[in-house]
Amino acid sequence: MIVSVSRSSISGTVCAPPSKSYTHRAVLITALSDSGCVHRPLISADTRATISACDAFGADVKLRGDSLEIQGVSGAPRTPENVIDVLNSGTTLRFMSAVAALTDGAVLTGDSSIRSRPNGPLLKALNELGAEAFSIRGNDRAPLVIRGRLRGGSTSLDGSVSSQFLSALLIACPLSSGETTISIKGELKSRPYAEMTLDILRKAGAEICTDGDIFRMRGGQSYRLAEYTVPGDFSSASYPLAAAALAGSATVEGLFPSRQGDSAIVDILREMGAEVSWDMESGEVRVSGADLRGREIDASQTPDLVPTLAVLGAVAEGRTVIKNAEHVRHKETDRIHAMAVELKKMGANIRERPDGLEIDGGDLHGADLHGYHDHRIVMALTLAGIVAGDTRIDTAESVDVSYPGFFEDMRRLGANVRAST
């Protein structure tokens, strides 16, 4: 699908979609318990992959109205009968690889993007904790073969690639037969996502002790998550909020305080010069545009914001430096390189750094852009098109991964966005 974007003025109110990250975790942890209900889940391509994988491991997940009713496996997932295809969901691949180590074995694969993403730290850890885990191609990429069973022990993880490896082990290891200790080497990138995992696990009754970058948990535990309501997604909300800062004003509802690191978008927009108010009790964030100013941004804990921040920096007065984001090169695509290439087509003065981007703000012009089959690239480039006008972006269907209603919400806010096949 190709989306055409014209210069637009933004105004109005939309509701933040449910959090993709919380939905993944709540669905899986409930599926590993006896039974429960996840209210207001995000139903998207990625979360459907997790739901399908949970079914493959023996759970029964049914959508009833605005809730998922889940009959779980009581801590004993079944050995899947077929290969698990995670489609484009890296979260599903990493989480389900750890769950597979609680069974007799499973094979996991995904699309071409998934088959290019590294999993070495997770495979190493699973092997050290008693499972047998390897890449069929011998390159740490999917397809992956995982054979159980986890028995506990000690392992370490390189924290510089993805916190998903840690989250996967935190979910699976309390269900193993022995005590597990996990140590993080180096800086843990995207730490808020690991904290999100711990938050839901503890709500489900898991006992996990943390001491800085060391995580300890006994084996033989069980989960109970009878009900869980998914909060609004700050990662997705960053797009309408940034659109308002760039081209008007808008209110996004459903944004309450949580463990989401991407709530940093509120402070970033304010520091760049936008008028921002957040009523934490009502969950409403209102942004009014202004002349934005460039600034230095540490993206180590907010990797999903990087494409949006690149667009803001391309328009803001002065220089914007996005740093400590080298792990963003290992997402659906190399998002640092992709944003540099595409914004240059629009006239941006942008340079790649090993760990991020350096951007001198200015005027953008319309262009034909490549979306890289990456939902966050497509949504960020749509924001650039709202400012520049006369812009076309391909592979726009990829927004279904995390924000199926993105283009509808943008039109609701006044964006002139038209889709064609």
Curated annotation (Swiss-Prot):
Glycoprotein found in the keyword field: no
The record's section on Gene3D superfamilies has:
Enolpyruvate transferase domain
Give the catalytic activity: 3-phosphoshikimate + phosphoenolpyruvate = 5-O-(1-carboxyvinyl)-3-phosphoshikimate + phosphate
Keywords carried by this UniProt record: Amino-acid biosynthesis, Aromatic amino acid biosynthesis, Cytoplasm, Transferase
Gene Ontology terms, MF aspect? 3-phosphoshikimate 1-carboxyvinyltransferase activity
Highest taxon of source: Archaea
Q: What is its EC number?
A: 2.5.1.19
Where is the protein localized? Cytoplasm
Location of the active site: D304
Look at the named UniProt entry and state the broad enzyme category this protein falls under. transferase
Annotated residues that bind phosphoenolpyruvate are located at K20, G90, R117, Q164, R335, R376
Any GO BP? chorismate biosynthetic process
Pfam families from the entry?
Answer: EPSP_synthase
Q: In which pathway does it act?
A: Metabolic intermediate biosynthesis; chorismate biosynthesis
InterPro entries named in the record: Enolpyruvate_Tfrase_dom, Enolpyruvate_Tfrase_sf, EPSP_synthase, EPSP_synthase_CS, RNA3'P_cycl/enolpyr_Trfase_a/b
GO CC annotations, alphabetized: cytoplasm
Name the residues that bind 3-phosphoshikimate.
Answer: K20, S21, R25, S162, S163, Q164, S190, D304, K331
The record's annotation in HAMAP family points to: EPSP_synth
Entry's NCBIfam families?
aroA
| Subunit structure, interactors included | Monomer.
The record's family statement is: Belongs to the EPSP synthase family.
Name of this protein: 3-phosphoshikimate 1-carboxyvinyltransferase
Q: Which organism is it from?
A: Methanothrix thermoacetophila (strain DSM 6194 / JCM 14653 / NBRC 101360 / PT) (Methanosaeta thermophila)
**Organism lineage:** Archaea, Methanobacteriati, Methanobacteriota, Stenosarchaea group, Methanomicrobia
